[in-house]
Amino acid sequence: MKRWERWAFNLTAAVVAVTGFVYFWMKNFLASSDPFAVVNHPWEATMLHLHVLTSPAFILIFGIILNSHIIRKLGASRMPNRKSGISSLILFATMLGSGYLLQVGTDAAWLRALVAVHVGSGAAFSIVYVSHLVVSARLGRRRPAVSSIREVA
């Protein structure tokens, strides 16, 4: 994976995660002092807009790293970061599907279920992906000696 791909994916993932968590917090844990208010916080709509508008860039970069990183790693066996990578992939697909369906759903019961799936998979993806990055960073510190041996052999 190229450096710009890693930075673009991490940046868009961070923006989508932060705006999603902040929007969820504003919508569900804040209460407006105005009994006639439609939103609980003045920035609630902005957080939702940033979340929804950043998500396509996040998905685009995911498609790029799918080709340059994920498919190649799926084909390799005994990768030390494999479990968190596969978990991230499954959670990303769940988060993506539920996020898309939230945009087009109309039934109140289905929307509640989709919100639960989207928030749950989004939170889980964020945690698992951060753990994937931490393990990758630790492996990267040990990798130069290992990669030089592989190049010689």
For every predicted segment, state its role.
Residues 1-153:
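Membrane-embedded alpha-helical bundles that constitute the cytochrome b-like, heme-associated redox core
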